[in-house]
């Protein structure tokens, strides 16, 4: 069987492994101890290092699925005998299922589907950001894993073409969906910016009110208050006399 140059797949696999590791690291981004893509589970990193030690749950799940499908591991030289048709069946079946629920939540991500909610005005609450469970992230993880850990160093040309073609399609879909998700986040950011401007104006108004109160002459205020009290006392006295006159008239 004709084989391509052995160095070619190694280059592709190495790049894919680096890309998968960078992808996981980005989804584990944290700010002030809170993980940005974890949803409301923001105190826990949503993803494990796929190639970490000990092996991640995702890596173990992929290994188990590959072994169950082909009866060999990804590093077995017999991977060269996997046909294009068999690889297609695996990618569309058992492998794809690893990125759907419940497998995704069990093996890949501890993120919550519920995003963090923030009150941006007295009567407006919005979900801010997104989480590692959305479709584009799953598709990118799938594409990187196809190239990084399905025997790309050893598979024959036809099976390798199945891997690269499928990974390219899935990655393109993921990138497109991610752009749409970024647009949604951008809309939320605009709402937050608008709320910030409104709250800034409100704060300026309150600060000006405090300044105005602090600039009032205490003596003048006291004098005016005493005058008001005196006026009230006179009013009560007059009212009382009128009531008495009314009673006298009708007794």
What positions do the PLM features span?
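Amphipathic alpha-helical polymerization modules
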Residues: 1-45, 151-251
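Polar, low-complexity export/assembly segments characteristic of proteins
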Residues: 21-24, 28-177
């Amino acid at each position: 069987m004709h084989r391509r140059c052995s160095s070619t797949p190694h280059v592709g696999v190495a790049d894919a492994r680096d890309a998968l590791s960078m992808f996981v690291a980005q989804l584990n981004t944290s700010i002030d101890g809170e993980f940005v893509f974890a949803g409301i589970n923001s105190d826990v990193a949503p993803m494990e290092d796929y190639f970490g030690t000990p092996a991640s749950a995702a890596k173990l799940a992929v290994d188990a699925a590959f072994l169950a499908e082909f009866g060999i591991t990804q590093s077995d030289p017999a991977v060269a005998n996997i046909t294009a048709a068999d690889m297609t069946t695996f990618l569309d079946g058992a492998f794809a299922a690893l990125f759907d629920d419940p497998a995704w939540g069990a093996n890949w991500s501890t993120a919550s589907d519920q995003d963090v909610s923030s009150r941006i005005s007295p009567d407006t609450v919005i979900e801010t950001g997104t989480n590692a469970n959305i479709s584009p992230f799953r598709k990118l993880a799938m594409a990187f894993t196809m190239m990084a850990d399905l025997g790309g160093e050893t598979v024959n040309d036809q099976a390798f073409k199945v891997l690269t073609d499928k990974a390219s399609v899935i990655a393109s879909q993921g990138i497109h969906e991610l752009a749409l998700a970024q647009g949604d986040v951008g809309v939320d950011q605009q709402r937050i910016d608008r709320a910030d401007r409104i709250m800034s104006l409100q704060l300026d108004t309150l600060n000006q009110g405090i300044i105005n109160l602090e600039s009032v002459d205490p003596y003048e205020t006291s004098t005016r208050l005493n005058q008001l009290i005196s006026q009230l006392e006179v009013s009560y006295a007059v009212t009382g006399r009128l009531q008495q006159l009314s009673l006298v008239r009708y007794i």
